[in-house]
Amino acid sequence: VTMSDIGGGQPNKDDQVTSGVSTGENAVETVDATKCADFLVVANRLPTDLVTNKDGSQEWKRSPGGLVTALEPILKKNHGAWIGWPGVPDVSPEPFEQDGKTVVPLALSADEVQNYYEGFSNDTLWPLYHNCIVPPTYREDWWRSYQKVNRRFAERAAEVAAPNGIVWVNDYQLQLVPQMLRELRPDVRIGFFLHIPFPPLELFDQLPWRDEIIDGLLGADLVGFHLPHDAVNFQRLTFVRRKHAITRGQINTPGHYGEVAVPIGDNEFRSVRVGAFPISIDSPRFNATARQQSVRRRSRELRQTLGNPEKMALGVDLSLIHISEPT
């Protein structure tokens, strides 16, 4: 398995849809997604949002975001599909084609959204992984819902992935999926990427279900993080908590991996690669945006306000975003 250097919103209870065909101008046709994807992305949210127009009609619109932008060309080239929640509880849209990829909605009930997503994912894992001032909340019912929903994602992925296909599971909401999917489809190659920090042993040990999470991630062939120290944290956990042999390699060097030896039988092991893959920047897109007339006009206004400096730089500081409010 290889992984490139690439790496939602609140549901509206009034939105309702019963099929994959929207009623807006951008209506879509449903398809059979069984064993369709040579390259399958599994994420909590879809790359498209179900929106309600002013006239009451509903349609699917492409979601903004770096992951969608980065993966779309790969999905088109490799007959890809994307499994995710459509962002609206208690609906069951059918799979459909959009922009050269197969979109496979996975329905979640209102209770599952509350317990699996708002509860365990965002009130347990998010503050724990970020070491927030606000302490995580640990609830057994949230954990059971997390297990149940992860199982459903894994089962749907097993149905959609083509024989010997590649499945890329994304982020903290779905950390049990790799192991579950491996049990269902040992033929596929599985990658997992975490889009948030991975905590050190001292923090992770607070989690009552820490061993289950570690085993879930080790179901993958390749586990990726943004930064080298996140990868090192994970490897250390596998050694201390699960007693697996590890080889750190040169995780700090691009293109190099550490490895974890996962026992699969008497004197047999499966190697799980661990590495850091920081997301890249779409430079051509930003360059094109900077050349737009509206942007250049606003730039001139700012220059005048700042005393006409020779050079002007724009910075966006993520630390201004409240860390306890995941999207």
Each language-model region and where it sits:
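A short, active-site helix/loop in glycosyltransferases that binds the activated sugar's phosphate group
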Residues: 221-296
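Short hydrophobic "strand-cap" motifs at the C-terminus of beta-strands
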Residues: 226, 315-318
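Conserved nucleotide-sugar donor-binding subdomain of glycosyltransferases
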Residues: 112-166, 295, 301-310
